[in-house]
Design a protein with these regions (language model features):
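N-terminal intrinsically disordered/low-complexity leader segments
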Residues: 1-13, 196-201
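N-terminal positioning helix adjacent to the helix-turn-helix/winged-helix DNA-binding module
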Residues: 7, 14-17, 21, 155
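Helix-turn-helix
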Residues: 17, 21-59, 63
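Hydrophobic alpha-helical connector segments
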Residues: 63, 74-106, 156-159
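Short, basic, alpha-helical segments at the C-terminal edge of helix-turn-helix-like DNA-binding modules
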Residues: 66-72
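Helix-loop "lid/cap" segments that line or gate small-molecule binding pockets
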Residues: 78-79, 95-100, 109-120, 146
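Hydrophobic alpha-helical segments that form the core
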Residues: 110-115, 151-172, 185-189
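Hydrophobic alpha-helical bundle segments that form small-molecule/ligand-binding pockets
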Residues: 120-122, 130-156, 190-200
């Protein structure tokens, strides 16, 4: 029984390692350029192990999206410990700014996957990528709602659209300063908002 439990634990650990590797490599290289061998190399496992856990590249993409979702849930759970919605939203923006060098090289992990997947005909995985972004939008809207800001869904859309835009430009221009400058503008915008304010704060 112990051996069986150990085997299952090792298998689960290996799958998690492969999933994390898939998320990193797909973010850095994109879907089309990434091979299963790339994932194996990043996870430091034989390529046969990748085939054992993930039969197709689409399964790896799905696993990477679940990794992004888990990372987002971990991030928002940490932010939820902060005392006020304004604090939480500002800390979210600060987390984006802290990732400026990664954004300059590779863009937003989920956003870049969503754009790449949208070009495919089947339309299933792009919906899954959209669901991760929707999760962030919903959390952000909930913060504005709790804060008492009118039109919380609109404010959430403004904030997340700004993030996607600054990630795209930071990546396209290979300039981390774009993320810093635009992130600072968002922090100032959040500081200017008060409950009962109109949308443009």
């Amino acid at each position: 029984v112990t051996n069986s439990v150990d085997r299952r634990a090792r298998a689960s650990q290996k799958r998690r390692r492969l999933t994390a590797a898939a998320a990193r490599v797909l973010h850095e290289q994109g879907i089309e350029r990434t091979t299963l061998a790339d994932i194996a190399r990043e996870a430091d496992v034989p390529v046969g192990n990748v085939y054992y856990y993930f039969k197709t590249k689409d399964e790896l993409v799905r696993a990477a999206l679940s990794e992004h979702r888990a990372h987002l849930d971990e991030l928002t759970a940490g932010l939820d410990q902060l005392p006020t919605p304004r604090d939480r939203l500002k800390a979210l923006v600060e987390a984006w700014i802290a990732q400026r060098d990664t954004a300059a090289r590779h863009g937003c992990p989920t956003g870049t996957l969503a754009v790449e997947l949208d070009k495919r005909a089947d339309g299933t995985l792009d919906a899954e990528a959209g669901a991760v972004i929707r999760r962030l939008l919903d959390w952000t809207a909930a913060q504005f709602r709790t804060w008492g800001i009118p039109a919380p869904d609109d404010h959430a859309l403004t904030l997340i659209s700004a993030y996607q835009g600054m990630s795209l430009l930071t990546n396209a221009l290979r300039d981390p300063a774009v993320m810093t400058r635009e992130g600072t503008r968002l922090l100032n915008w959040l500081d200017s908002l008060e409950p009962g304010d109109g949308r443009d704060g």
